[in-house]
């Protein structure tokens, strides 16, 4: 069975850009983010449905970190099969690191390379060939390799 801890990692390429996405996965992912997210709608994440996006502010105690979009995926209907929160923030390296370091301090740990996909495999969200195809898709450098990897992922429909 997958580790019981909560993992975090940058889901977008490292470096500066317009936005960055930080992914958090684990049974308590939603609970770790909720106290630090001020939704524009004033709803707490714990009361929100799966597969929803919420505009708001991420804070670090009394200090605001960034205006963000938080996307919520509840287990088992997520990529990993666990509760997943994706934080879309402004893409400066400073903001990315501030958010990562903050949640590491809240008990998350940095995900190892491929660990989100490993958890998906261990939760029966995909088979081994599909998990390997995800790595191939990420590494694809041309249309042919992209299409081949994509076809391998969808040979059998995943259980989402």
Residue map of PLM features:
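A glycine-rich (often HGG/GG-containing) alpha/beta subdomain
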Residues: 1-147, 151-152
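Residue-level detector of conserved catalytic or cofactor/ligand-binding positions
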Residues: 151-160
């Amino acid at each position: 069975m997958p580790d019981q801890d909560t993992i975090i990692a940058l889901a977008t390429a490292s470096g500066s850009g317009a936005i960055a996405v930080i992914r958090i996965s684990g049974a308590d992912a939603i609970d770790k983010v909720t106290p630090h997210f001020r939704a524009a709608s004033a709803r707490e994440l714990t009361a929100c449905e799966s597969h929803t996006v919420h505009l708001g502010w991420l804070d670090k105690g009394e200090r605001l970190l960034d205006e963000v979009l938080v996307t919520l995926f509840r287990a088992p209907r997520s990529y990993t099969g666990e509760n997943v929160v994706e934080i879309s923030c402004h893409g400066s390296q400073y903001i990315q690191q501030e958010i990562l370091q903050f949640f590491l301090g809240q008990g998350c740990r940095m995900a190892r390379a491929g660990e989100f996909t490993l958890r998906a495999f261990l939760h029966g969200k995909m088979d081994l060939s599909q998990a390997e195809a995800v790595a191939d898709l990420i590494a694809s450098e041309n249309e042919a390799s992209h299409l081949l990897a994509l076809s391998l992922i969808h040979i059998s429909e995943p259980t989402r």
